[in-house]
């Protein structure tokens, strides 16, 4: 049986062999691995890029005080970004399942069409959910637009839901029963040992104690700071301010402080920031001459 951390190590080893830069999680609150600069920003422009990383993801509204066996306000994704998307991307994915000990001939693996959209990022793509014996474990996406900019070349994104994948591999019904590691002297460390208290306390904070007045003020500050930084222009710091605004919105949403009509307006404000950041980042790479594209050409010429 693979432990939770062995699943991560296996995926790291597999995607390392496929030429991916193995990166670290983005060190800010994000709702999904797509928000990492290694995906959102690197999907913009013509430069080639391959990366893989674990991303802790926060969705405050999904908290259940640690009482739901498969719904969390903090969970893990394993993200793979391939640009340009290779024609054999599905075969590469199946290869990763084999590395995890999943024999495609012995399991029901289905690709269910499910086009993807993230309104706050101004991003969308053609995609599929991957169902393993009736459980969704992965999302495939071919990005068409990011930050309102067309993706040329197309970026392929593979997002594994690590908890769901681990629940299948370990054959458990509750995320809290997952074995994180075997531990010293055979003393198992379970997911509940690592995260259950965090789920209880963060859910309590998100739903009951987060200050709406403070969060509204923070949102306005982060929005203003992102706009100011784009005028400099500093695309990457501006993106971080936009991410902070997005997480603040998610906290307000969980707190029930935003009405249905206000929600659409706030999403629009974040989307406008994302689009402006995307353009600023593209412009900054263009000013640099798209260095990774030039580097690839130089390497080819040298060969």
Curated annotation (Swiss-Prot):
Its EC number is 6.1.1.14. One of its GO terms (biological process) is glycyl-tRNA aminoacylation. It is an enzyme of class 6 (ligase). One of its GO terms (molecular function) is glycine-tRNA ligase activity. It holds the Pfam family tRNA-synt_2e. It is found in: Cytoplasm. It comes from the Bacteria. Keywords: Aminoacyl-tRNA synthetase, ATP-binding, Cytoplasm, Ligase, Nucleotide-binding, Protein biosynthesis. One of its GO terms (cellular component) is cytosol. It catalyses: tRNA(Gly) + glycine + ATP = glycyl-tRNA(Gly) + AMP + diphosphate. The keyword Ribosomal protein does not apply. The keyword NAD does not apply. NCBIfam families: glyQ (TIGR00388), PRK09348.1 (NF006827). Belongs to the class-II aminoacyl-tRNA synthetase family. Tetramer of two alpha and two beta subunits. PANTHER family: GLYCINE--TRNA LIGASE, CHLOROPLASTIC_MITOCHONDRIAL 2, GLYCYL-TRNA SYNTHETASE. This is Glycine--tRNA ligase alpha subunit. It comes from Bordetella pertussis (strain Tohama I / ATCC BAA-589 / NCTC 13251). The lineage of its organism: Bacteria, Pseudomonadati, Pseudomonadota, Betaproteobacteria, Burkholderiales.
């Amino acid at each position: 049986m693979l432990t939770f951390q062995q699943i991560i190590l296996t995926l790291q080893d597999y995607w390392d062999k496929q030429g991916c830069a193995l990166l670290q999680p983005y060190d800010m609150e994000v709702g999904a691995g797509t928000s990492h600069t290694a995906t959102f920003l690197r999907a913009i422009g013509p430069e080639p890029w391959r990366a893989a990383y674990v991303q802790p993801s926060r969705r405050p509204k999904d908290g259940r005080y640690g009482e739901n066996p498969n719904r969390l306000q903090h969970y893990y994704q394993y993200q793979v970004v391939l640009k340009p998307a290779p024609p054999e991307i599905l075969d590469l994915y199946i290869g990763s399942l084999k590395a995890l000990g999943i024999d495609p001939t012995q399991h029901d693996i289905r690709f269910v069409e499910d086009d993807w959209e993230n309104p706050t990022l101004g991003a969308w793509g053609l995609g599929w959910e991957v169902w393993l014996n009736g459980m969704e474990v992965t999302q495939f996406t071919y990005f068409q637009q990011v930050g309102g900019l067309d993706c040329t070349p197309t970026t392929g994104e593979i997002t594994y839901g690590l908890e769901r994948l681990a629940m299948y591999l370990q054959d458990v019904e509750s995320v809290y029963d997952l074995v994180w590691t075997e531990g010293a002297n055979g003393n198992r460390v379970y997911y509940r040992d690592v995260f259950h208290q965090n789920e209880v306390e963060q859910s309590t904070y998100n739903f009951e104690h987060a200050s709406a007045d403070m969060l509204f003020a923070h949102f306005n500050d982060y929005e203003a700071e992102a706009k100011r930084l784009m005028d400099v222009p500093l695309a990457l710091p501006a993106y971080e301010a936009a991410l902070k605004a997005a997480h603040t919105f998610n906290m307000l949403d969980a707190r029930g402080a935003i009405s249905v009509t206000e929600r659409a307006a706030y999403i629009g404000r974040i989307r406008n920031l994302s689009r402006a950041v995307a353009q600023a980042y593209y412009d900054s790479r263009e000013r640099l001459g798209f260095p990774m594209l030039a580097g690839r050409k130089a390497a080819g010429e040298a060969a």
